[in-house]
Swiss-Prot record:
Protein name stated in the entry: Uncharacterized protein YMR085W
Keywords: Repeat
Pfam families listed in its UniProt record: SIS
Residues covered by the SIS domain: 105-244, 277-422
GO terms under biological process: chitin biosynthetic process; fructose 6-phosphate metabolic process; protein N-linked glycosylation; UDP-N-acetylglucosamine metabolic process
Organism this protein belongs to: Saccharomyces cerevisiae (strain ATCC 204508 / S288c)
UniProt xrefs under SUPFAM superfamilies: SIS domain
Keyword Coiled coil: no
Source superkingdom: Eukaryota
GO molecular function, one term: carbohydrate derivative binding
PANTHER family noted in UniProt: GLUCOSAMINE--FRUCTOSE-6-PHOSPHATE AMINOTRANSFERASE, ISOMERIZING, GLUTAMINE--FRUCTOSE-6-PHOSPHATE TRANSAMINASE (ISOMERIZING)
Length: 432
């Protein structure tokens, strides 16, 4: 009998059909054609019993299957990948988050005087999306840094800082350089990566694996939403000892459990988005995306995807900056996509959208289902709405970014652009 050992079951899909997943403290001993699993944890039985499971990944997980492109496949996989990142970690019955990869550093992490999140590209946007909930739950300063700029500035780092490094591959050069810098400064480091054997996962003190699976498309789609959830879970876990945040934590944990099913609802917008791209968007080469609060990160990520995949100029703008000469551009009728889901800023965002409509703009509004504020304008043809399910404010960006992924994808398809390998990409096609 042959045994294969790997940190990623995707690499074994073409060789095996059954796997045994080791858990924390397991030691696998292979001798004379037999596998024995021992538990090294003190107080546990010497032998551990692990179920032999069918490798569900198989070749289908690293092939397109019924989809035309890997990007489309990976957009649709987000229902499953968001479940995977929470599996065994989020307990809706006890309202607790368990992150075994951080437990050994519990004391140091909860004593943090400052949290610094460091990343590049889409991972940087996921950090921006999670920053407000860290500030709210932890009540400490939270910085988000672009890895290259962070190193260039020789930032001040102290021993009581916690530095979180986020990367899809775990091999992003700029992020690794920033990690080495923080290690020299003796800060506590956390890695949030998809590949458990990567450089960032090995060099950080502790970490969270996103369990996203292979992402073969250049555009980051499912990794973005998985990183977003992983960071929210870290914020929930680190704030568990704060009594004043109990009710807020419960609200978020309960909302996390239904995110996968809500993503499925969002994906049902695809036929409407295809029609929208075909009739209204494909002839344009400039787009403006408006967001505020949690949704500014969604605007940044959406604009990035449209540049990267659709080859259009797209700009993300804080909604309250609309009056600073942006309305002059809006009068030229570039498509404006506004995030207007319900949160603390909804009335102000609605006011900005009204200003756009008054200037003969025809915004595309991403709003919650049942939000009737623009119903009259919709009937007049002044606006188009893409309605997504409502969730707690700090998670709404997970649902809001998916329509932008679909818009970017279908704009590229309408222009006959190869979405999996866009031109002039600074990244190589990943196989992680």
């Amino acid at each position: 009998m042959e045994f294969y050992l790997s940190s990623d079951c995707a690499s074994l899909a073409r060789y095996v059909s059954k796997v045994v997943y080791l858990e924390d403290n397991d030691i696998a001993h292979i001798y004379d054609g037999e596998l024995h699993i021992h538990c090294s944890k003190i107080g546990s039985e010497d032998f551990s019993f692990r179920t032999v499971q069918k490798l569900e990944l198989e070749l289908s997980k690293i092939k397109k299957g019924p989809y035309d492109n890997f990007m489309q496949k990976e957009i649709y996989e987000q229902c499953e990948t968001t479940k995977n990142v929470m599996r065994g970690r989020v307990d809706a019955f006890t309202n607790r988050v368990v992150l075994g990869g951080l437990e050994n550093w519990l004391t140091e992490l909860r004593r943090a005087k400052r949290i610094i999140m460091i990343a590049s590209k889409a991972s940087f946007h996921s950090c921006l999306a999670a920053r407000p909930i860290f500030e709210e739950l932890m009540e400490v300063p939270v910085n988000v840094e672009l890895a290259l700029d962070f190193v260039d500035r020789n930032c001040c780092i102290f021993r009581n800082d916690v530095c979180i490094f986020v990367s899809r591959s775990g091999e992003t050069t700029d992020t690794i350089n920033a990690l080495n810098y923080c290690i020299k400064k003796e800060a506590v480091t956390i890695g949030v990566v998809n590949c458990s054997g990567s450089s960032i996962s090995r060099f950080t003190h502790c970490g969270v694996h996103t369990n996203t699976g292979p992402e073969k498309g250049i555009a980051t789609t499912k990794s973005y939403t998985s990183q977003y959830i992983a960071l929210v879970m870290i914020a929930l876990w680190m704030s568990e000892d704060l009594v004043s945040k109990i009710e807020r934590r419960k609200e978020i944990i309960q909302a996390l459990t239904i995110v996968p099913s809500q993503i499925k609802e969002v994906l049902e917008l695809e036929p409407l988005i295809i029609e929208l791209c075909d009739k209204k968007l494909k002839q344009h080469d400039t787009f403006l995306l408006l967001g505020r609060g949690y949704q500014f990160a969604s605007a940044l990520e959406g604009a990035s995807k449209m540049k990267e995949i659709s080859y259009v100029h797209s700009e993300s703008i804080l909604t309250n900056e609309l009056g600073h000469r942006v309305l002059a551009v809006a009068s030229d009728n570039p498509p404006i996509i506004a995030f207007a889901t319900k949160d603390a800023f909804s009335p102000k965002i609605a006011s900005c959208i009204d200003q756009i409509i008054e200037r003969k703009g025809n915004p595309i509004i991403i709003c919650n289902k049942g939000h009737k504020i623009w119903e009259q304008d919709k009937q007049k043809g002044n606006v188009v709405t893409l309605e997504v399910p409502q969730t707690v404010d700090c998670l709404q960006g997970i649902l809001n970014v998916i329509p932008l992924q679909l818009i970017s994808y279908w704009l590229a398809i309408k222009k006959d652009i190869g979405v999996d390998l866009p031109r002039d990409s600074a990244m190589s096609a990943p196989d992680i």
